[in-house]
Amino acid sequence: SSAAVYKTKDTQLTESDTLSPENFYGETKLKFERLLHWYNRIHGINFVSLRYFNASGAAYGLGENHEQETHLIPLVLQAALGKKDCIKIFGSNYPTSDGTCVRDYIHVLDLANAHLLALENIRETPQTYNVGTGKGYSVREIINIAEDITGKKIFAVDVLAREGDAAYLVADPTKIEKEWGWKAEHDI
């Protein structure tokens, strides 16, 4: 599933927070979660919902390759490498510390570990877990971190916010940490 199923708020999101997607993507994820609950009820099919926050990173040795890249971190790194002239910042008037969206970036290897634990811990009663680090980074913070690491200036331009982009999506991973002993091992 996805963090996109939640109603936006300016603090960490828990599994019991209000479900109210702000975009089509989140709505489809929530509908699928509801379908799984019906399948469990009618057919006894057990499942675990893992609500991802922003997946990032690459598997070591495999890398990452998206055609028509849309993910912030690879775009920022492309700009640092001179493959892009600048980064578009979609919205600079959000109610956040620097006006840009804040996201919780969770490494794909940490997501893989959560999936393995889900297979080991599936029960008759469906469970839902947030899979994130509990730390949020704004778009400008990601750009600044990339500049610090690469030593390159990354140019950015503010453009209009995209419809349905939440201001703040950061996980409260307490439930998965306590119940399964899972914790993100990678940071930004």
Go through each PLM region and give its residues.
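Structural signature of the Rossmann-like NAD(P)-dependent dehydrogenase/reductase core
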Residues: 1, 48-54, 104, 130-132
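Short acidic, glycine/proline-rich loop/turn micro-motifs
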Residues: 60-62, 100-101
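C-terminal catalytic core of Y-nucleophile DNA break-rejoin enzymes
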Residues: 70-73, 107
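C-terminal substrate-binding subdomain of Rossmann-fold SDR/epimerase-dehydratase oxidoreductases
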Residues: 78-188
